[in-house]
């Protein structure tokens, strides 16, 4: 997949995947593997320019969780915009961005990336934030061992609050972030063993600062999501959906943090 095939956008509507006006929910056998999808393939279209209605679209909600200041926001910003800034204000509650991927001809896969605050005072809201997610990423900071110690806590939190339609756990990817720092050390054998013991689908050493393994990790997760979505699609949203206001990437005026 060429980088030129990847582009990013943000929705101008409520981030709840159940209410996005850009996608229509078609529950047919060929198109029941995404949260919201729109497929109207025209095999007789001989035009070189493909109309938007001929493009198959799938939207998937993905959680990014982990302790505060591990770099979740920086990873999302790097992936969605290609930009890194050393100074970020801490996420308050939840933020979100959407990344559109031209996965194959006439097929767009959109990842709705939910940036969940890592502060304990927001822990009571995670059940609401996790709703309808099809996958998750847990991030820890290689330069702060305590953030790795918390990974198991976050994994258990996900397991207890969100599952696939068949009641199996959602796929979870582990990111060992800030690999560019001189104080960072990656024990590959230990992480391989840890992921196997705790049912992670895999792990990547990443750096938003140096753009290391960000696209590779997301591509790996997207492949897993598409495989899972063949037989599992999230349940229909209930009426008591969470109302959020799109922030356009702006953070609150809390203390600044350097998150690579």
Curated annotation (Swiss-Prot):
SMART domains listed in its UniProt record: RAB (SM00175), RAN (SM00176), RAS (SM00173), RHO (SM00174)
Biased composition (Basic and acidic residues): 248-260
Keyword Methyltransferase attributed: no
Keywords: GTP-binding, Lipoprotein, Nucleotide-binding, Prenylation
PROSITE patterns found in the cross-reference section: RAB
Disulfide bonds: none
Tree of life domain: Eukaryota
Short sequence motif Effector region: positions: 88-96
MF-aspect GO terms: GTP binding; GTPase activity
Segments for region (Disordered): 11-50, 231-260
Classification via InterPro entries: P-loop_NTPase, Rab29/Rab38/Rab32, Small_GTP-bd, Small_GTPase
GO biological process: intracellular protein transport; melanosome organization; vesicle-mediated transport
Biased composition (Low complexity): 21-49
Lipid attachment residues per UniProt (S-geranylgeranyl cysteine): 258-259
Family: Belongs to the small GTPase superfamily. Rab family.
Matching NCBIfam families: small_GTP
Name used for this protein in its record: Ras-related protein Rab-32B
């Amino acid at each position: 997949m060429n980088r030129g095939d990847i582009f990013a956008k943000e929705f101008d509507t409520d981030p709840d995947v159940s209410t996005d006006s850009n996608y229509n929910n078609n529950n047919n056998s060929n198109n029941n593997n995404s949260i919201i999808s729109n497929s109207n393939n025209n095999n007789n279209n001989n035009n070189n320019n493909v109309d938007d209605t001929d493009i198959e679209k799938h939207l998937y909600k993905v959680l990014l969780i982990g302790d505060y200041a591990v770099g979740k926001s920086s990873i999302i910003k790097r992936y969605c915009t290609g930009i890194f800034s050393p100074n970020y204000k801490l996420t308050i509650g939840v933020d979100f961005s959407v990344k559109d991927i031209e996965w194959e001809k006439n097929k767009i896969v959109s990842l709705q990336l939910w940036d969940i605050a890592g502060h304990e005072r927001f822990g009571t809201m995670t059940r609401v934030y996790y709703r309808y997610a099809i996958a998750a990423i847990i991030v820890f900071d290689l330069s702060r061992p305590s953030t790795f110690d918390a990974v198991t806590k976050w994994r258990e939190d996900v397991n207890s609050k969100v599952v696939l339609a068949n009641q199996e756990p959602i796929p979870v990817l582990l990111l060992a972030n800030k690999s560019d720092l001189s104080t960072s050390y990656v024990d590959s054998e230990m992480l391989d063993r840890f992921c196997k013991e705790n049912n992670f689908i895999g792990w990547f050493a990443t750096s938003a600062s140096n753009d290391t393994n960000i696209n590779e990790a997301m591509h790996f997760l997207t492949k897993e999501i598409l495989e899972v979505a063949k037989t599992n699609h999230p349940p229909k949203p209930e009426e008591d959906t969470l109302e959020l206001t799109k922030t356009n990437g702006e953070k609150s005026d809390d203390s600044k943090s350097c998150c690579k």
